[in-house]
Design a protein with these regions (language model features):
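Charged C-terminal helix
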Residues: 49-52, 226-265
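Short, small-residue alpha-helix embedded
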Residues: 142-143, 201-225
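N-terminal basic/disordered segments at the start of proteins
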Residues: 14-30
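Short pre-catalytic strand/loop immediately N-terminal to key active-site residues, enriched for Gly-Thr
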Residues: 7-13, 191-205
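Conserved N-terminal subdomain of the carbohydrate kinase-like
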Residues: 3-6, 26-110
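Phosphate-handling active-site elements
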Residues: 29-33, 192, 218-232
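Nucleotide and nucleotide-moiety/phosphate-recognizing core
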Residues: 86-95, 168, 182, 188-190, ...
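Conserved phosphate/ATP/ADP-binding segment of small-molecule kinases
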Residues: 117-191
Length: 265
């Protein structure tokens, strides 16, 4: 059985973070392992507290996974400090990690920055050059490219700039504010659009975590990047269309809507 590692924060509501990652990877037919960067006290209405992992303990978790259940792919999500980012980059290099998907969690839904300037510097200088593919939303792509994005042409310019800067593929997610659910994959000097329709579901907590984890799971199974993105988009559309309705705020998706179906293949 193929394996995938998620390096991210824990979400006590179960809709995002490692909880969403593990459910997504399982539903997509791979065995999931994890290294926790932070514990969060949160629910569908917001975050009330965060307890960050120490660099030493994060390193211990990564050593434990890489020396035993070696991952076929790695997904990296919420990492809130420069020190933790440095640990992750060091361990990825030490163990020769392959098929690395980075979801650069930098901006909250409200638009507020989630990373200090030193953490952004560590992310861009140490972690992004190790990535196979980045999955920024529009605000994150604007930060990484230093370009404004107001339309599809802006997405293309930003994705091209990010790819050239960090030497990796970039999946720029347009659903945040530009269009229905059309995402642009920029790789090897060219772009490819993956069309999608917006699902009329207000419960979208954890969509970024879920998409990046589904991509990692499919890369782990041997699908190429284009196929992995296409399959991941189909999976997340199905999870949203299942219309799970939990909590008082922006609730989670139904990650297990098709547990015995084709996504595990």
């Amino acid at each position: 059985m193929k394996t995938a590692l998620t390096i991210a924060g824990s979400d006590s509501s179960g809709g995002a973070g490692i909880q969403a990652d593990i459910k997504t990877m399982t539903a997509n037919g791979v065995f999931a392992t994890c290294a926790v960067t932070a514990l969060t006290a949160q629910n569908t209405t917001g975050v009330t507290d965060i307890l960050e992992s120490t660099p030493h303990f994060l390193a211990e978790q990564l050593d434990a996974v890489f020396t035993d259940i070696v991952p076929d792919a790695v997904k990296i999500g919420m990492v809130s400090s420069a020190e933790l980012i440095a640990v992750i980059a060091e361990k990825l290099r030490q163990y020769g990690a392959e098929r690395v998907v980075v979801d650069p969690v930098m901006v909250a839904t409200s638009g507020a920055k989630l990373l200090r300037d030193d953490a952004i510097q560590a992310l861009t200088s140490q972690l992004l050059p190790l990535a196979t593919v980045l999955t920024p939303n529009i605000p994150e792509a604007e930060i990484l490219s230093d370009l404004p994005i107001t339309d599809a042409a802006g997405m293309e310019a930003a994705a091209r700039t990010i790819s050239q800067r960090y030497g990796c593929a970039v999946l720029c997610k347009g659903g945040h504010q530009i269009n229905d659910a059309d995402d642009l994959l920029w790789r090897d000097g060219g772009g490819k659009w993956f069309r999608g329709r917006r699902i009329p579901n207000p419960n979208t907590h954890g969509t970024g975590c879920t998409l990046s984890s589904a991509i990692a799971a499919n890369l782990a199974k041997g699908y190429d990047l284009d196929q992995s993105v296409e399959r991941a988009k189909a999976y997340i559309s199905g999870a949203l269309a299942a219309m799970l309705d939990l909590g008082k705020g922006s609730g989670p998706m139904n990650h297990m809507f098709d547990l015995k179906g084709g996504f595990a293949e």
